[in-house]
């Protein structure tokens, strides 16, 4: 019997997954509800439609998103092939003519002899090998099915994330390691503020510019996840009883309690990334860098993932997903794209590439491929399946996710070049196995 896989959703992840499957001789039933049923964000019936920006971000190898794109080129990604063909001048970034970009992908996928297109809404998960790549605006009926399959508490409908910072960029002379009331091991880095420093920070925060909500996000309610700037506007002392509460966090250098304390919590197993506890925010990214840079210790902080609050649909991947993008409780069911907790166009496509390769291996009775964590594709899969289950939030690819180099290199550009070189070597070895 001929092997086939259902792919639900023809966005960036679904289109890439379908392409990787047909490249390996696997038949694909590709389901896309547009244009029969539109989402609030899409405008066309094309596959891999770019709904926000036309930029696929940095292209150079001193940036992690440039590395993941190069890895995808080595693995014959249709998304990157199309982006390269449809590129428009954008300095060091890869930006595209969005109509040419999605048109090229639509034509290649639709016209492939192994692809059958189904223009209909999927409301229940099919039997047999399937990849779910329905994106952040998954239809309510399918979301209910996913909830039933993964467990009600493991499906989320919005993203409320605090900024994540590279540990190497924190001024360790100004912060101290301590847990509140010294309970358990000292697990947090603490940024102490004097009253004057707090007041300066407060004024900057309440007057900072926030990002505009998109029309389709306006119904989102963030219970228990109030943006820090909204909390601050309720009164100058509100944060002192919330995320900046200094009680039980005396500075071991002085023995005194600071006026306010921001806690940073380790975000990855390697201890290279820290998140700002309780600082989910809707500030514009430039404002986040400026305002949070007023906090002692964070003056030169490298924010690898800015705080966001927006409509999203994603599963708790650390709980329910394998690094191969297979569901732990049903190994013929794969997830790909933003649904898995990867953030961004390129990252979504990369997860589709990995899921597509592994779904092909599954139906052809081959061993699944766990992409090496030294690679950008592997570092992302490793992060979303091993991050904290309790506080899991979507993540962009960044060098903070990569394992550290055996020899410490202080110069950032040189360090990034070495990480990129190691990543591409790792992917070349994977490509040889395929």
UniProtKB/Swiss-Prot annotation:
GO terms for biological process: tRNA methylation; tRNA wobble uridine modification. PROSITE patterns: GIDA_2. Keywords: Cytoplasm, FAD, Flavoprotein, Methyltransferase, NAD, NADP, Transferase, tRNA processing. The keyword NADP applies. It catalyses: uridine(54) in tRNA + (6R)-5,10-methylene-5,6,7,8-tetrahydrofolate + NADH + H(+) = 5-methyluridine(54) in tRNA + (6S)-5,6,7,8-tetrahydrofolate + NAD(+); uridine(54) in tRNA + (6R)-5,10-methylene-5,6,7,8-tetrahydrofolate + NADPH + H(+) = 5-methyluridine(54) in tRNA + (6S)-5,6,7,8-tetrahydrofolate + NADP(+). GO terms for molecular function: flavin adenine dinucleotide binding; tRNA (uracil(54)-C5)-methyltransferase activity, 5,10-methylenetetrahydrofolate-dependent. GO terms for cellular component: cytosol. It comes from the Bacteria. It is an enzyme of class 2 (transferase). Its EC number is 2.1.1.74. FAD binds at residues 9-14. InterPro entries: FAD/NAD-bd_sf, MnmG-rel, MnmG-rel_CS, MnmG_N, TrmFO. Its cofactor is FAD. It is found in: Cytoplasm. NCBIfam families: gid_trmFO (TIGR00137), PRK05335.1 (NF003739). Belongs to the MnmG family. TrmFO subfamily. Catalyzes the folate-dependent formation of 5-methyl-uridine at position 54 (M-5-U54) in all tRNAs. This is Methylenetetrahydrofolate--tRNA-(uracil-5-)-methyltransferase TrmFO. The lineage of its organism: Bacteria, Bacillati, Bacillota, Bacilli, Bacillales.
